[in-house]
Design a protein with these regions (language model features):
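Acetyl-CoA-dependent GNAT
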Residues: 73-78, 148
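Short, charged/polar surface micro-motifs in flexible loops or helix N-caps
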Residues: 65-68, 77-80, 102
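Vicinal oxygen chelate
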Residues: 2, 11, 34, 97-151
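A cross-kingdom feature marking solvent-exposed beta-strand/loop segments within repeated
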Residues: 40-44, 81, 125
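Beta-rich catalytic cores
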Residues: 5
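Core segments of cupin and vicinal oxygen chelate
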Residues: 12-67
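Eukaryotic phosphotyrosine signaling hubs
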Residues: 8, 90-94
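Exposed loop/turn and edge beta-strand positions of beta-sandwich/beta-sheet ligand-binding modules
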Residues: 53-54, 91, 129
Length: 151
């Protein structure tokens, strides 16, 4: 098999409105879909841990980009199981966005109160350069920003 591309990345959240404040309002992603979906049919009984009747799903992306989009599902009024994982645990530990100006973005996010674990200086190398840094979203999920050069 040869896949054409990654279609989307779905990350379950506890509070979709708080998640939207971060991804839409702070990171300037665009909401391309916001819907309540029926989860009672099809393969849902095999792909869900608990029975749920509906879910709210939001698709987020950047209008000018053709890269994969994020899907943010949640079940309003129903708390999900589990905790976010760290980089050395099994599962999807983080996702990363390539940006042009890391130092400016780091300053902007810090000014908006976004949690940068250890502070931005923790991510600088011995020459004081910044090739990437992580933040925590409202659910404690690691989100990385990098230069796109694989360093």
């Amino acid at each position: 098999m040869k896949a054409k591309a990654i279609s989307h990345i779905a990350v379950f959240v506890r509070d979709l409105d708080k998640s939207l404040e971060f991804y839409r309002d702070i990171l300037a992603m665009t909401v391309t879909m916001d819907a309540i979906q029926d989860t009672t049919g099809g393969s849902r009984s095999q792909t869900y841990k608990h029975r749920r009747a509906t879910r709210r799903v939001v698709h987020l992306g950047w209008a000018e980009s053709e890269v994969p989009y994020l899907v943010r599902p949640c079940h309003p009024g129903d708390q999900p199981d589990g905790e976010p994982i760290k980089l050395d645990q099994v599962g999807v530990s983080h996702y990363s966005f390539t940006v042009d100006d890391l130092p400016s973005l780091a300053e902007e996010l810090a000014a908006k109160g976004v949690n940068i674990p250890g502070g931005i200086n923790a991510f600088k190398n011995s020459q004081g350069e910044l090739s990437s840094f992580y933040v925590l979203d409202p659910d404690g999920i690691l989100v990385q920003f990098d230069r796109g050069d694989g360093v």
